[in-house]
């Protein structure tokens, strides 16, 4: 056991995490040079295209150290993006140490900091590593000082390496062996294994990635999942070298996979504990905190007969992504679909792309909303994540919106732009600290403003240098109202949105104008109105198409023309009473695009 090292790598996006892991695999001979592929661990197409890591992966490597001993290194890859911080805390729970990789040109960024604090809270040993020293703009001295100043760990003797050229990789491996402690645990105790991740394989059923904390799991053992109490037999156990390699047993401290032919999707929830069916452990391991979705959106299949496939796809996806939440929803305009909860907008985009790619679905998404806390006049408090569920205005005592604490790291010269942006988004400044050339600003911002387009705007006002990390802190009373869109006097539920009272005029007008362009003309006038409660704040009319009924009159009396025109008017009036308007799909998409 003292030759096992479990570690993960924490880094900001693009600081070279995945490349460094490729090098470690290559040096330790996990794959032959022919199979070596850039970003081996980012196995999803989407991860490669966007160049980000989304899912945690694991690899077991053998390393012969300079002291002549052979060590087993279990390396768990983690994502760096703020929306996937949950995946990170999960990976860290299985480790004893973490490598903090910092780009020697860019320096410390907000996410690095957030994930690093998560690691320190879990009592992991954090080892700093300066990467990309081959770049001309690399300044390892400055960055080392920055790490000490901002993060507060000693970085003067930090290993300097370049994952791209392979310089300093051996030193990295030595540091892992020297500075990261071996796992603790009792091989004789009853089995306790933590499920770090699980995914669905159409041939094998559920595959779970586990970290053995105590005891041993052998092939053929009967084990039980502690939260569900169900028993299964371990058909195969093994490790990833990144290839799946079968073994006869997983010992204490090791990280590997278990396949038990579990067919039903929620058979092995992530964060759960496995133990043996006979002499099992008394209590489960402390898992992870369940994440609450921050953003909700209704997602509907474009053709209604895809509803079943859509449900299956969501079930399979939620196994692999523990933070996904969904419940069925129906809309009079869009038919049947699901209300899905996400951790943030990037998460939402990724999930939607994965559904469209991996499961071949055509989907339409309504505007994203956050969760509001609503105090009713009856004294009870409810949580609303769908604008259509908001009670009538006269039943609401107080609306409270979620507030996030946003930590922004930005170079001095862009500070002004960032502050202007935060004020525009109704933020209040809490703190500001200068660290050398960087400034750390803390703001309290309404989450609704953050999820819309804050991140993109932040990047563009700071030329991409600012970095953001945010978490939910509390609900604050706010003057929020529901903006409804009425078409010929009927509310269209899928177009409703909850916004701040100061924005309603501007938003209502823009929406109504946009809808006017998109709704095709009918044989009668269509009134498009934006309303708050019973008060109409904006209106426009799609004019009717009409036939020229007076064309056949040559001269003659005006009363003849009047008669024909009045007859046409009567007809249009009757038509309007029975006619109903189809709202085209583009109109729903337009509402989303309006924020841009």
UniProtKB/Swiss-Prot annotation:
GTP binds at residues 14-19, 131-134. One of its GO terms (molecular function) is GTPase activity. Signal peptide: none annotated. Its EC number is 3.6.5.n1. It comes from the Bacteria. The keyword Nucleotide-binding applies. It catalyses: GTP + H2O = GDP + phosphate + H(+). One of its GO terms (biological process) is positive regulation of translation. GO terms for cellular component: plasma membrane. Coiled coil: none annotated. Keywords: Cell inner membrane, Cell membrane, GTP-binding, Hydrolase, Membrane, Nucleotide-binding, Protein biosynthesis. It is a peripheral membrane protein. It is an enzyme of class 3 (hydrolase). It is found in: Cell inner membrane. The keyword Nucleotide-binding applies. InterPro entries: EF-4, EFG_III/V, EFG_V-like, EFTu-like_2, G_TR_CS, LepA_C_sf, LepA_CTD, LepA_IV. Residues 2-184 form the tr-type G domain. Belongs to the TRAFAC class translation factor GTPase superfamily. Classic translation factor GTPase family. LepA subfamily. Required for accurate and efficient protein synthesis under certain stress conditions. May act as a fidelity factor of the translation reaction, by catalyzing a one-codon backward translocation of tRNAs on improperly translocated ribosomes. Back-translocation proceeds from a post-translocation (POST) complex to a pre-translocation (PRE) complex, thus giving elongation factor G a second chance to translocate the tRNAs correctly. Binds to ribosomes in a GTP-dependent manner. NCBIfam families: lepA, small_GTP. This is Elongation factor 4. It comes from Shewanella sp. (strain ANA-3). The gene is lepA.
């Amino acid at each position: 056991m003292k030759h096992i090292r479990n570690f993960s790598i924490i880094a900001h996006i693009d600081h070279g995490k995945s490349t460094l892991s490729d090098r470690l695999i290559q040096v330790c001979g996990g794959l032959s040079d022919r199979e070596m592929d850039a970003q081996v661990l980012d196995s999803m197409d989407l991860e490669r295209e966007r160049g980000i890591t989304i899912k945690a992966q694991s690899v077991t490597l053998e390393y012969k150290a300079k002291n002549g001993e052979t060590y087993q290194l279990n390396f768990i890859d983690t994502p760096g993006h703020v929306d996937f911080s949950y995946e990170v805390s999960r990976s860290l729970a299985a480790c004893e140490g973490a490598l903090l990789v910092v780009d020697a040109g860019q320096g410390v960024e907000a996410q690095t900091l957030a994930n690093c604090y998560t690691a320190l809270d879990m009592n992991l040993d954090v080892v700093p590593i300066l990467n990309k020293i081959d770049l001309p703009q690399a300044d390892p001295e400055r960055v080392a000082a920055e790490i000490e100043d901002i993060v507060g760990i000693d970085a003067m003797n930090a290993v300097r390496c370049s994952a791209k050229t392979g310089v300093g990789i051996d030193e990295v491996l030595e540091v892992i062996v020297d500075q990261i402690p071996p796992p603790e645990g009792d091989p004789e105790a009853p089995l306790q294994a933590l499920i770090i991740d699980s995914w669905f394989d159409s041939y094998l059923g559920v595959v779970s990635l586990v970290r053995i904390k105590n005891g041993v799991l052998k092939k053929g053992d009967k084990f039980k999942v502690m939260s569900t109490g169900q028993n299964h037999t371990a058909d195969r156990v093994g490790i990833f070298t990144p290839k799946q390699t079968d073994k006869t047993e997983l010992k204490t401290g090791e990280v590997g996979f278990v396949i038990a032919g579990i067919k039903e999707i929620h058979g092995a929830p992530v964060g759960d504990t496995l133990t043996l069916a006979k002499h099992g452990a008394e209590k489960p391991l402390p898992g992870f905190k369940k994440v609450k979705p921050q953003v909700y959106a209704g997602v509907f299949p474009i053709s209604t007969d895809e509803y079943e496939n859509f449900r299956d796809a969501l079930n399979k996806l939620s196994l692999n992504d523990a933070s996904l939440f969904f419940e069925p929803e129906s809309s009079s305009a869009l038919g049947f679909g699901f209300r899905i909860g996400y951790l943030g907008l990037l998460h939402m985009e990724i999930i939607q792309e994965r559904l469209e790619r991996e499961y071949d679905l055509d989907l339409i998404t309504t505007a994203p909303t956050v969760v509001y806390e609503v105090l009713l006049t009856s004294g009870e408090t409810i949580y609303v994540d769908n604008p259509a569920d908001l009670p009538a205005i006269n039943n609401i005592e107080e609306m409270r919106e979620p507030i996030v604490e946003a930590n922004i790291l930005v170079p001095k010269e862009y500070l002004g732009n960032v502050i202007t942006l935060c004020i525009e988004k109704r933020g209040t400044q809490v703190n500001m600290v200068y660290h050398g050339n960087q400034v750390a600003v803390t703001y309290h911002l309404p989450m609704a403003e953050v999820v819309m387009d804050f991140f993109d705007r932040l990047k563009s006002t700071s030329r991409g240098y600012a970095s953001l990390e945010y978490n939910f802190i509390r609900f604050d009373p706010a003057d929020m109202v529901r903006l409804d869109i009425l078409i010929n006097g009927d509310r269209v539920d899928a177009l409703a949105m909850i916004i701040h009272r100061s924005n309603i005029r501007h938003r209502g007008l823009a929406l109504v104008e946009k809808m006017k362009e998109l709704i095709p003309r009918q044989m009668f006038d269509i009134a498009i109105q934006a309303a708050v409660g019973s008060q109409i704040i904006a209106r426009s009319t799609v004019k009717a198409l009409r036939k020229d009924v007076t064309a056949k009159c040559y001269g003659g009396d005006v009363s003849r023309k009047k008669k024909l025109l009045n007859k046409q008017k009567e007809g249009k009036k009757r038509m309007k009473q029975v006619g109903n308007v189809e709202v085209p799909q583009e109109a729903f998409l337009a509402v989303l695009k309006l924020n841009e």
